């Protein structure tokens, strides 16, 4: 296990060495000593049930629940959807569990469903899951498509049974989670990531106002304990809805403005319009997905470099980080912190401070 972690650290820091100087600080990788059966998510393709026994990442209780659901579906009067013939009903099912042993389930079916199942259809299954696993099925969502093509994330989905969403506590804040919102899959390292980011920046003692971008702006900013102004830009409509709900159900220290920014136009405008004569310094934090930053954000960072001067980048994919730094040009890494967020995978989370 530990040799894999050291190798991941070496690969991570080797990938960014061209942007480091002799004075760059590269800290030892942080990790949690559990590299199997840690993830609180599992998605099951009902055409490939071997996924259950072959999985060593998701929590064992989720794999047991997946078997119970698979048996129920295989014994039902409706067949699994066959992608070759285009016939069938059940397509896939996914699970997300919180630390309170509450379960969220999303089912994808194909074709007309109203005359087949109703909200009582899964009552016995819910009871069976509780009796065998002591897990409360808190909500079931149903999503349907008219053909073999999967629908968009927000398309044709509805709460089918139970309450709307589950909550996940991160650093004292209860975040609402529904299907397709942003959530961390590893409960062991989730708080480690955001605590480390806050310490890496020394954020509670930094007096600057924050400009933050990413689907995890809530995790980064709502968990701060100090009072400061925050402009938070998030590209996902589902995250936007759940974050607004989270705001109303928690006591938040920061003065935050949330913006839905699907094309990154708002954060680009914010950076482009920063006044060089404004004496209020700004702290910029970007946390893009695996595709990295959009070009308009990169151009805005380049234009505002005389004001921003430095920023923090939370990277989940080193190739995107490297590409973005090349495109930003004339920058270097002052310090970096690797975190093994998802053991036994190729991905390594890296927090970097970039000087322009």
Curated annotation (Swiss-Prot):
Residue numbers annotated as active site: 316
SUPFAM superfamilies, per the entry: S-adenosyl-L-methionine-dependent methyltransferases
E.C. no: 2.1.1.-
Protein residues bound to S-adenosyl-L-methionine: 184
GO molecular function list: RNA binding; RNA methyltransferase activity
Gene3D superfamilies the record matches: 2.40.50.1070, Vaccinia Virus protein VP39 (3.40.50.150)
Location in the cell: Virion
InterPro entries, alphabetized: SAM-dependent_MTases_sf, TRM2_met, U5_MeTrfase_fam
Presence of keyword Methyltransferase: yes
PROSITE patterns in the cross-refs: SAM_MT_RNA_M5U
Top enzyme class: transferase
PANTHER family: TRNA (URACIL-5-)-METHYLTRANSFERASE, TRNA (URACIL-5-)-METHYLTRANSFERASE HOMOLOG A
Protein name: Putative RNA methyltransferase R407
């Amino acid at each position: 296990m530990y040799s894999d972690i050291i190798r991941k650290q070496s690969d991570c820091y080797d990938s960014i060495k061209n942007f480091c100087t002799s004075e760059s600080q590269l800290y030892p990788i942080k990790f949690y000593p559990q590299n199997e059966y840690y993830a609180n998510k599992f998605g099951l393709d009902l055409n490939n049930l071997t996924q259950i026994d072959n999985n060593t990442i998701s929590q064992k209780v989720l794999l047991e629940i997946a078997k119970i659901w698979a048996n129920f579906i295989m014994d039902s009067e409706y067949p699994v959807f066959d992608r070759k013939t285009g016939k069938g009903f059940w397509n896939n099912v996914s699970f997300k569990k919180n630390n309170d042993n509450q379960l969220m389930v999303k089912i994808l079916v194909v074709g007309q469903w109203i005359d087949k199942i109703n909200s009582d259809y899964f009552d016995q299954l819910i009871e069976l899951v509780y009796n065998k696993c002591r897990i409360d099925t808190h909500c079931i969502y149903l999503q349907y498509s008219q053909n073999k093509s999967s629908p968009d994330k927000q398309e044709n989905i509805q709460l089918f049974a139970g309450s709307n969403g589950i909550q996940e506590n991160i650093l004292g804040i209860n975040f609402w989670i529904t299907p397709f919102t942003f959530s961390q899959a590893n409960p062991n390292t989730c708080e480690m990531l955001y605590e480390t980011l806050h310490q890496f920046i020394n954020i509670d003692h930094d007096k600057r106002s924050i400009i933050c971008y990413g689907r995890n702006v809530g995790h980064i900013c709502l968990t701060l304990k100090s009072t400061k102004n925050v402009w938070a830009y998030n590209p996902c409509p589902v995250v936007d809805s759940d974050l607004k709900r989270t705001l109303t159900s928690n006591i938040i220290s920061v003065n935050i403005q949330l913006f839905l920014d699907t094309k990154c136009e708002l954060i680009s405008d914010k950076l482009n319009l920063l006044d060089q004569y404004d004496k209020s310094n700004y702290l910029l934090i970007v946390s893009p997905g695996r595709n990295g930053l959009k070009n308009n954000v990169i151009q805005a960072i380049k234009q505002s470099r005389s004001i921003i001067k430095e920023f923090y980048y939370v990277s989940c994919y080193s190739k995107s980080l490297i590409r973005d730094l090349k495109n930003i040009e004339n920058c270097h890494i002052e310090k970096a912190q690797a975190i093994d967020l998802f053991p036994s995978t190729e991905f390594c989370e890296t927090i970097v401070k970039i000087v322009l």
